[in-house]
Every structure is written in structure tokens, then in C-alpha cells.
């Protein structure tokens, strides 16, 4: 029987982007939830290039006496998942919990995730109950979940919920992956041997607005498709092959009909022209698909730019500068 590693310290990573209204309540409730764990803990708040007072508020909270807050300040906005990866690079805990800053997933759920991870799970996911989102957000989330499940074969119910817990070896494995487009729940599940989901409460957003606009959701879907699989490129080749075969079949049929019914039936070769045109269009799609396959692989290999740049890390009694945190 595999021995379950004990959890001595819990790290909570929270990406923050223009959340100055919710920060005081977020810090208070997250700290209170962590105090109930009976374990050592730290709370890493990653400012993802906020344009409001979020960064200065995080720095002040981190410098307070007795604070468990670590403020990780990025130089600009890199997106939710890259901000979380920046936080991962500075965690010191055995179990890492991720949480959104909007308080729609209550921090009070953290002890439940830690208790479930204590049972030996590598990844503890969550499923939002009675989601307090718009109809469009719910439908988009359901579509994305189905896309991920069909592509990865992992039957997880709610990939969009970022309230999750990961064992330290899962975090270390993800940090060794250097692709620029990262979707953390999917990446974590590729390394997890044991994963489980538990239901959690979902509240209405009290402060500000959602940072995921319609276009950002569309971009997220494209990122998911391109970072998960090269199937769309292969489907392009398949589609081109089908068109080419149909064009060739039509050409043969037209030749037979011309022989059987004479040249008048073939409209002076117009139908034959279309048949040949379909053949060439199909061949072009096949060629484009093959080129796309190679370009996609080259693109995957050369994506070596940093996912984020940490400008400053502020914790109780210490401040590190950007020179120490280039990623």
C-alpha cells in the first residue's frame, strides 16, 4: 500500500487583477479559513498588472507584523493562469490551493480541500453548485468542459473552477513545462495519479465585474484547442481528402454520362471544369493541413519566451527585485 505523504504546510495562491474592492474581505476570510487548518500556511497574492490600487494594498498587507501574506507583483497583465504559475514558483507548502479573488468560491471551502487531499489525492478539483453566473457564461463553460473531456479523456465535471488543491510534486512537474499557453487544471491532471472532485458552494459576485469578456472567452477556447491537440490541423487534411475524392468521383461520373448521353448533356464541359476545380481545391486543403501540422510542431518547439516577469516579491521582512525573479 502506497504511503500517503503528510501535509505540514499549505500554500494558497490567488491571482489578483483590479480587485481593490474585494481585497480586504478576501484577505480576512482566507486568513480565517487557513487558521482553522491547524497547519502552517502562507497566502500568495499575485498582482497581474492591476491598474487600480491592488498592488499597493497587497504590499501593505504583506509587510504587516505577523502577516502570512506574500505579495507577488508582475510588471503587466499576463492572464489568470500565467499569474498562478508565477505564484507557484514561490510556494513553500506541501499542498497548494488555488482560489479566485472575486469571492464567488468562498475561501471557507479550503479546509474541505485540504482534508480530501489528506486522504492521498494528488489533485482535488471542485464542481460549482447552483452557479451564480449569466446564462451565457454557464453555456460557454459547459461547452469548454465537453471540449476538454473529449480531447483529454479525463471525465472532470468543472474545469473552469479554479478552487483546487495540488500536491507539491504536481506543482513541480508543471513548473518544468515551458509552453506559453497554459491551462492549469488540464496540465495538472496529466501528472496526477489520483484525482477527485468535490461539490462546493458558488456565490454571487459582490465586487466589480468579471474579467472574462466575450472575446476573452473566445480566445480561451482557441487557446484550449491549440494547446491540447493538433486535431483541427488533421481534420483540415481529412476534409481536403474528402473534397478531392468527391471531385474525382464526380469527374468519372461526368465522363461516363458524356459517353452515354453525348456532349450536349455535359454543357460544353462546364461540369467537368467544376469537377477538376474541386479536385484542385481538395488537394490544396490537404497541402495546407500538412503545412499547418509542421508549422504547429515548430511553433510548439520554439515557444521559449517567458510566461511572466515578476517585478517584485514582498513578504514579511523581505523584498526581492525583478533581477531575482526573471522567469
From Swiss-Prot:
<dbReference type="GO" id="GO:0009245">
    <property type="term" value="P:lipid A biosynthetic process"/>
</dbReference>
<dbReference type="GO" id="GO:0099621">
    <property type="term" value="F:undecaprenyl-phosphate 4-deoxy-4-formamido-L-arabinose transferase activity"/>
</dbReference>
<dbReference type="GO" id="GO:0046677">
    <property type="term" value="P:response to antibiotic"/>
</dbReference>
<dbReference type="InterPro" id="IPR029044">
    <property type="entry name" value="Nucleotide-diphossugar_trans"/>
</dbReference>
<keyword id="KW-0472">Membrane</keyword>
<dbReference type="GO" id="GO:0009103">
    <property type="term" value="P:lipopolysaccharide biosynthetic process"/>
</dbReference>
<dbReference type="GO" id="GO:0036108">
    <property type="term" value="P:4-amino-4-deoxy-alpha-L-arabinopyranosyl undecaprenyl phosphate biosynthetic process"/>
</dbReference>
<keyword id="KW-0448">Lipopolysaccharide biosynthesis</keyword>
<keyword id="KW-0046">Antibiotic resistance</keyword>
<keyword id="KW-0997">Cell inner membrane</keyword>
<keyword id="KW-0328">Glycosyltransferase</keyword>
<keyword id="KW-0441">Lipid A biosynthesis</keyword>
<keyword id="KW-1133">Transmembrane helix</keyword>
<keyword id="KW-0808">Transferase</keyword>
<protein>
    <recommendedName>
        <fullName>Undecaprenyl-phosphate 4-deoxy-4-formamido-L-arabinose transferase</fullName>
        <ecNumber>2.4.2.53</ecNumber>
    </recommendedName>
</protein>
<keyword id="KW-0443">Lipid metabolism</keyword>
<feature type="transmembrane region" description="Helical">
    <location>
        <begin position="270"/>
        <end position="290"/>
    </location>
</feature>
<dbReference type="GO" id="GO:0016780">
    <property type="term" value="F:phosphotransferase activity, for other substituted phosphate groups"/>
</dbReference>
<keyword id="KW-0444">Lipid biosynthesis</keyword>
<comment type="pathway">
    <text>Bacterial outer membrane biogenesis; lipopolysaccharide biosynthesis.</text>
</comment>
<keyword id="KW-0812">Transmembrane</keyword>
<dbReference type="InterPro" id="IPR001173">
    <property type="entry name" value="Glyco_trans_2-like"/>
</dbReference>
<feature type="transmembrane region" description="Helical">
    <location>
        <begin position="236"/>
        <end position="256"/>
    </location>
</feature>
<dbReference type="GO" id="GO:0005886">
    <property type="term" value="C:plasma membrane"/>
</dbReference>
<comment type="pathway">
    <text>Glycolipid biosynthesis; 4-amino-4-deoxy-alpha-L-arabinose undecaprenyl phosphate biosynthesis; 4-amino-4-deoxy-alpha-L-arabinose undecaprenyl phosphate from UDP-4-deoxy-4-formamido-beta-L-arabinose and undecaprenyl phosphate: step 1/2.</text>
</comment>
<dbReference type="InterPro" id="IPR022857">
    <property type="entry name" value="ArnC_tfrase"/>
</dbReference>
<keyword id="KW-1003">Cell membrane</keyword>
<comment type="similarity">
    <text>Belongs to the glycosyltransferase 2 family.</text>
</comment>
<dbReference type="InterPro" id="IPR050256">
    <property type="entry name" value="Glycosyltransferase_2"/>
</dbReference>
<comment type="function">
    <text>Catalyzes the transfer of 4-deoxy-4-formamido-L-arabinose from UDP to undecaprenyl phosphate. The modified arabinose is attached to lipid A and is required for resistance to polymyxin and cationic antimicrobial peptides.</text>
</comment>
<dbReference type="Pfam" id="PF00535">
    <property type="entry name" value="Glycos_transf_2"/>
</dbReference>
